[in-house]
Structures are given as C-alpha cells and as structure tokens.
Amino acid sequence: MVGANISTMSISDNDSTRFRPDFTGGVRIALIPERSIFGAEIDVLYSRQGTSSKKGLDDDNNSIRYLEKSHYLTVPVLLNIYLRKWKEEDEDESKIPRLRIGPQIGFCIGGNEVKEVKGRRKQQFITPWEKGSFNRIDYGVTAALSYWFVEVRYTFGMANVFKEGEKSTNHVISVTWSDVW
C-alpha cells in the first residue's frame, strides 16, 4: 500500500500546531475468512509524521517557528467489518465496503527538529540510538473506511511523542491505495 498522510501533534501548551503533508507506505497481511462478515489484518507501514507550530517571540521580537518531523514504522492490528453481505458475484473482498478498527504501535526510527527564526533554520537530526527528544514507542487507535483499492484512515495517538516537556500526541489522516497480488 502507498499513499499520502497529513499529520499534526496535539501539544498541551500550544494551540497553534498545523497539519503537514507527507508520505506513508508498506505491506498488509490480511486474514480474510471466506464469505464472513469479519476479517483481520496486520500492516507494517513506514510513516513520516510531524507538525509545524509558532511558539512566540525571541528576545529581538522575531517570531519563532518549529517544525517537528518523525519517521515511524507502524504496526496496526485491525479488525475488518464488512458493511454488507457477500453476494455470488463478489469476486474478492475489495469490492465490499469495510470498516477497520484496532490498536497500533509505532517505533520511532528517527526524526528532526527545525527551529526557524527570521528565515534562518537551525536543524537537529535525531537517530533512534541517540538520546534525542523523541520517545521510541508510540501507540494509539486506528479506524479506517475502505472500498475497492482506496482506504481513508485516522490514527489517534495516545503516547507522549517527546521524552520531556509538554504532553504531545500524534494525529494522522492518511489516504492509501493498495492492491492484492
């Protein structure tokens, strides 16, 4: 599966965070019982997530803008609920609208933080083996609607993204295209 996502972080002391567009892609392992109303799947996805925000002024009265980007391997385990009964002419499950819901765990494999003041950027790269500011594990709940080869998915993060400081959680909306080979 491959697609685009928009993500943001809810940060407890900052109400000026914005969604930012990025990429997601990976593989799906599906257990589809024949002619059942339920199924299950496990996805392994690469997902770039983050946010941009304005955080006040510096000592010279210049506005400060932050951009946080993080790179995750996410593993959602989803229950598939088929929204109508199978018919004789149904060749495959992709033609039946589906609701997918379940938990997701994410592993931060890197990221960077950019601080921009007066058009000048200062960037800090974070790798998983560094003691950076990102927590390595993220978890949340995922819900999706799928039809044919298109899926719209929302992930509500529940883990704190940063090791220290304000409480912040990931929120991701993605649209993906997938095929079964």
Describe these PLM feature segments.
Residues 1-30:
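Short glycine/proline- and aromatic-enriched beta-strand/turn motifs that initiate or cap beta-hairpins
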Residues 37, 45, 49-54, 125-181:
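Predominantly the C-terminal beta-signal and adjacent terminal strand-loop region
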Residues 20-24, 70-72, 94, 136-138, ...:
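Membrane-spanning beta-strands of outer-membrane beta-barrel proteins
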Residues 32-38, 84-96:
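Short loop/turn motifs that connect adjacent beta-strands in outer-membrane beta-barrel proteins
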Residues 2, 23, 38-42, 75, ...:
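Transmembrane beta-strands of outer-membrane beta-barrel proteins
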Residues 29-33, 81-83, 107, 147, ...:
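Residue-level signature of outer-membrane beta-barrel architecture
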Residues 8-19, 49-71, 108-142:
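Extracellular/periplasm-exposed beta-strand and loop segments of Gram-negative cell-envelope proteins
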Residues 74-80:
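Short, proline-centered helix/strand-breaking motifs
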